[in-house]
Amino acid sequence: MKIVKYWDDFFDWVKGAELVELNEVNTKDDPVRPELDNKFRTAHGRKIFGLMDKKEDIEGVACVAFTNEIPSTVKELELMSKEADLVSAHRAGQVGSTAVADTLWSLKRGAGKKLMRELQKEIKKMPNIKQLVTLSPLTPMATHYHIRNGAKLIKINTTTQNFEYEIR
């Protein structure tokens, strides 16, 4: 059937997509926290991950901080990741016990789900990380995305919400 063939072609790029670490992103593309510059996103052990397709195009982005607690604001995220980074100097570079995805966005249909699955796999390789959580805005879109992708809502804050993903 033509529809099945079109559908397979439409999502074919997902099969070869892989998670890569990035040095920077166009922060204006970030629909969640465009005010955070690349310096913030990569300081104190924070990382930017991109979902790269076969053509080496970035189709989705996740910014992750490593902390020892679950933040409820960006300021807490900043302070907690700084603290975890300082402590890591005494633990052979193992930063924090909690990975916090503070912003995620996709540039292509299907990239968000694939990005989160690949991020879960990447986090599993980090022996010091015990949980993967988000610092998400209080929006129906964020709630729907995380619940649809298997996360559990663990806390609602004044301006954000935290979801927890199983580390697979």
For the regions a language model picked out, list residue spans one by one.
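Conserved acetyl-CoA-binding loop of GNAT-fold acetyltransferases
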Residues: 147-157
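Conserved GNAT acetyl-CoA-binding A-motif
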Residues: 99, 124-138
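A structural microfeature
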Residues: 58-60, 155
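Short, well-ordered beta-strand micro-motif
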Residues: 50-52, 63, 164-168
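Conserved beta-strand-loop-alpha-helix junction that forms the acyl-donor binding cleft
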Residues: 105-106, 133-144, 157-162
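Conserved acetyl-CoA-binding loop-helix of GNAT-fold acetyltransferases
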Residues: 106-124
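Short amphipathic alpha-helix that is part of the acyltransferase structural core
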Residues: 1-44, 48-52, 57-58
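Conserved acyl-donor/pantetheine-binding loop and adjacent beta-alpha core of acyl/acetyltransferases
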Residues: 63-103
